[in-house]
A protein has these predicted regions:
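Catalytic subdomain that performs nucleotidyl-dependent activation
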Residues: 243, 321-402, 406
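ATP-dependent adenylation/nucleotidyltransferase module used to activate substrates
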Residues: 154, 158-328, 332, 340, ...
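Rhodanese-like catalytic fold shared by cysteine-dependent sulfurtransferases
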Residues: 51-59, 63-69, 75-109, 115-173
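Short, positively charged and aromatic/hydrophobic N-terminal segments
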Residues: 24, 30-33, 38-42, 46, ...
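Tryptophan (W) side chains
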Residues: 3-5
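The feature marks non-catalytic terminal segments
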Residues: 374-453
Length: 453
């Protein structure tokens, strides 16, 4: 009798999910194997490799340093927001097998990971079929991050307990992790980050006395840092203003929401969370769902902020966002415009939008994040596993990444290219412009050409 059906992928996956059935089936196969070993041997190898394909965070921690290599399968726009220490970027699908073999030949275990462990498991199973045995990290980067955060919270609790005991004995207290992070803003990153934050507020007149500002937190590094900077500004108490730290849950998956809440707790940011159904609303939209999502999010934030008595919302766009937007407008939109440091809302009377991170460089934000061992998410969309276009401002990742890479390339030739792009919208000479728009009305140079003769 032939047992070729056992090679069916779906059948094997179902067996993997039912251990009792698998044990029974393997016992059955051991009897059949004596009669027909040829067909069974391939199955047994496949079952063995697939049953051992996942590795947990706990198991990963137990591995000796240098005995394994992590391969990050996420794209550049995600890896730029953080990678597991020691990981390298995985090669594309065609080169992945060769990359894995290279590390396996060095006697190392190869561990793949993606955002949640879905794609990495599929890739590991595919490589197993080719006889290349690699592992997939359970839960992916998100699962690793949650496990790490839990560990750090336990360490912080121990520090607090030790400090209580030290206080009673008159011993010196140890700084908590939150205090260390706040200290880094005042000391190490004062010039690169806090001073530029204050400069933007003064230069563009972003904060006035008695303002009540909703600090809009998406969960990424930019908005979380902005929240800490506002707390530091308020600590100086130059004039009175109030803050609300606003988080909108537009339909986050459970893990992403937990990461946001854990980071807020670590950073001592008292967030106010409200829910909406934006993700469900844009789920069926094929064209530009991210753009629509970004527009809808802003509307919800304005509405909730106004309900809470705020007169301003603050967004975490930084210097690099500004210059990329200027260049993208020219290259993809055939227009010259910038991301403004502040705007009056057209739909919510009395409300303003401010961008106090306007002068802060993204590399400095990343340096602050990495120096403090912080980990954030880029897009908390519940479609993160399969969506490759999400970006907080609604622009596709590919376009923004292309523009970012183009600027970096131009900088190799001209080191002033970034500041030149930024200043280009400050030095517009209307006499050298063919046409411009104001309040929706287009004006041509021909309108006044003869009058200027």
């Amino acid at each position: 009798m032939e047992w070729l059906w056992i090679y069916d992928q779906q059948c094997i996956q179902q067996l993997m999910q039912n251990k009792d059935l698998l044990l029974y089936f393997e016992s059955f196969l051991s009897i059949i194997n004596k009669r027909n070993p040829t067909n069974i041997v391939g199955y047994e190898r496949k079952v063995e490799s697939m049953s051992n394909i996942n590795i947990s965070y706990k198991e990963l921690k137990q591995l000796e340093k240098g005995s394994y290599q992590l391969l990050d399968m996420r794209d550049e726009s995600n890896t730029s927001y953080g990678m597991i220490p020691g990981a390298v970027v995985a090669a594309d699908e065609e080169e992945l097998a060769a990359q894995a073999k290279e590390y396996l030949d060095q006697g190392k275990k190869v561990i793949l990971y993606c955002t949640k462990g879905i794609f990495s498991k599929e890739a590991a199973e595919k490589l197993a079929e080719e006889g290349i045995n690699v592992l997939s990290l359970e839960g992916g980067y998100t699962g690793w991050l949650l496990s790490l955060m839990k560990e750090e919270q336990e360490n912080d609790q121990k520090t607090e307990q030790n400090n209580k005991e030290a206080e009673g004995k008159g011993k010196k207290k140890e700084l908590t992790r939150t205090q260390e992070i706040e200290k880094s803003i005042r000391k190490k990153f004062h010039k690169q980050i806090f001073s530029k934050f204050v400069k933007a507020i003064k230069t563009y007149d972003l904060v006035q006395e008695n303002d009540k500002i909703a600090i809009c937190i998406s969960g990424g590094k930019d908005s979380m840092l902005m929240a800490k900077l506002f707390q530091e500004l308020k600590r100086h108490n130059k004039f009175h203003f109030d803050l609300v730290f606003l988080v909108m849950d537009p339909g986050y998956n459970e893990m992403n929401r937990q990461i946001i809440e854990n980071n807020a707790k670590l950073l001592d940011i008292p967030i106010t969370v409200f829910e909406s159904d934006i993700f469900d609303a844009v789920y069926e939209i094929e064209k530009s769902p991210c753009y629509l999502c970004a527009r809808m999010r802003r509307g919800y934030l304005y509405s909730k902020a106004k309900e809470l008595g705020c007169n301003k919302i603050a967004l975490g766009h930084h210097y690099d966002d500004v210059i990329e937007t200027i260049l993208m407008g020219m290259l993809y939109g055939a227009q010259v415009q910038t991301m403004m440091p502040k705007l009056h809302s057209t739909n919510f009377e009395g409300m303003e939008l401010i961008r106090p991170m306007y002068l802060i460089r993204e590399d400095d934000i990343k340096h602050w994040r990495d120096y403090n061992g912080l980990h954030f998410i880029q897009c908390a969309c519940k479609f993160t596993d399969t969506c490759t276009t999400c970006n907080p401002d609604g622009v596709t990742k590919s376009k923004r990444m292309e523009t970012k890479q183009l600027i970096a390339k131009m900088k190799e030739i001209n080191p002033y290219v970034e500041s030149n792009i930024f200043k280009s919208v400050e030095n517009v000479n209307l006499k050298t412009i063919i046409a411009y728009k104001k309040d929706g009305v287009k004006h041509s140079f021909l309108d006044t050409y003869d009058q200027e003769n």
